Curated annotation (Swiss-Prot):
Keywords: Repeat, Ribonucleoprotein, Ribosomal protein, WD repeat. GO terms for molecular function: protein kinase C binding; ribosome binding; translation regulator activity. InterPro entries: G-protein_beta_WD-40_rep, RACK1-like, WD40/YVTN_repeat-like_dom_sf, WD40_repeat_CS, WD40_repeat_dom_sf, WD40_rpt. Belongs to the WD repeat G protein beta family. Ribosomal protein RACK1 subfamily. Disruption phenotype: RNAi-mediated knockdown causes a complete loss of nlp-29 expression following fungal infection by D.coniospora and a partial reduction following physical injury. Required for the expression of antimicrobial peptide nlp-29 in response to fungal infection or physical injury. WD repeats lie at residues 5-48, 58-99, 100-141, 143-186, 187-227, 228-268, 269-320. The gene is rack-1. The lineage of its organism: Eukaryota, Metazoa, Ecdysozoa, Nematoda, Chromadorea. This is Small ribosomal subunit protein RACK1. SMART domains: WD40. GO terms for biological process: antifungal innate immune response; chromosome separation; defense response to fungus; embryo development ending in birth or egg hatching; mitotic cytokinesis; motor neuron axon guidance; negative regulation of translational frameshifting; polar body extrusion after meiotic divisions. GO terms for cellular component: axon; cell body; centrosome; cytoplasm; cytosol; growth cone; kinetochore; nuclear envelope.
Length: 325
């Protein structure tokens, strides 16, 4: 049987703060990468299709999107690749025209840091989560259409995501109250509370077919939930704080940023198949420890994994065939 492995092929270097989120878009075999950072910017990268042999830089920032005046916590790309959406600790969201490289809308309503943002599958609706403990729904004109308060989180809302389907769409949210919540988009009412985490939840990710989601956070447990049945499926041990998660777009893999490592599980047999660690001299990062991996994104073809770290670097891994013994 052919075995696949992840191989570090290079880096993207340009941020001067932690890389808080990464988003990708591919058109005509050309991948555009966006990254948000604590340096208050969003960088747009051109990524080389051919990786260098020395594992050095494999792309360059071609544009810097500026406007936020505090850490940028999240960035996503519209499904047509024309727009980006960002959230910041400056309490606002911004919509960006990627062709022009300018912010076209500023979304003002949250009273505290915006921690997470997302586009609906049809790009017509926007959701945001904040330290003000609220979830807000917006249109693309930056009008707040609804604020979820009934049954909402009792602590910071750390992450919000739409299901990828336009049919019976839901929003999945999680927060520092240790709860993962699923909301009906049609009426903004709570559909399910997923309870099981023993610490704050940092991240949720929804599978490409919308049938399940995974959550992770302080307790180091990757929990899988059935979104259709509204039940817990199983738990995978991360053994350290989980900062980010992403399903592969075309393999039955779940990828998690766990402390300084990246763990990849094959969900078919529920086994960890890979653990990726940055090879870095400990003196090169703060507190003499390895940089933490805090953001993850796959390319749309599932061949490339982009990982953002607290040493301000994006490391780029590619799926390759493992050499047989």
């Amino acid at each position: 049987m052919v075995q696949e492995q992840m191989k570090l092929t290079g880096t993207l270097e340009g941020h001067t703060g932690w890389v808080t989120q990464i988003a990708t878009y591919t058109r005509n075999d050309k991948t555009t990468v966006l990254s948000s950072s604590r340096d208050k910017t969003i960088l747009v990268w051109d990524v080389d299709s051919v990786a260098p042999v020395d594992e050095g830089p494999i792309g360059r920032p071609v544009r810097s999107l500026t406007g936020h005046n505090h850490f940028v916590s999240d960035v996503v790309i519209s499904s047509d690749g024309q727009f980006a959406l960002s959230g910041s600790w400056d309490k606002t969201l911004r919509l960006w025209d990627l062709n022009q490289g300018v912010s076209t809308r500023q979304f003002i309503s949250h009273t505290k840091d915006v921690l997470s943002v997302a586009f609906s599958a049809d790009n017509r609706q926007i959701v945001s989560g904040s330290r003000d403990k609220s979830i807000k729904l917006w249109n693309t004109l930056a009008q707040c259409k609804y604020t979820i308060t009934d049954d909402c989180h009792t602590d910071w809302v750390s992450t919000v995501r739409f299901s990828p389907s336009n049919r019976d769409p839901v929003i999945v949210s999680a927060g520092w109250d240790k709860v993962v919540k699923v909301w009906n988009l049609g009426n903004c009412r709570l559909k399910t509370n997923h309870i099981g985490h023993t610490g704050y939840v940092n991240t949720v990710t929804v599978s490409p077919d919308g049938s399940l989601c995974a959550s992770g956070g302080k307790d180091g447990q990757a929990m899988l939930w059935d979104l259709n049945e509204g039940k817990h499926l199983y738990t995978l041990p991360g053994n350290d704080v989980i900062n980010a998660m992403s399903f592969s777009p075309n393999r039955y893999w779940l990828c998690a940023a766990v402390g300084s490592s990246i763990k990849i599980w094959d969900l078919e047999d529920k086994k960890e198949i890979e653990e990726l660690k940055p090879e870095i001299a400990s003196s090169g990062s703060s507190r003499g420890s390895s940089p933490q991996c805090i953001s993850l994104a796959w390319s749309q073809d599932g061949q490339t994994l982009f990982a953002g770290y607290t040493d301000n670097i994006i490391r780029v891994y590619q799926v390759s065939i493992r050499a047989s013994n």
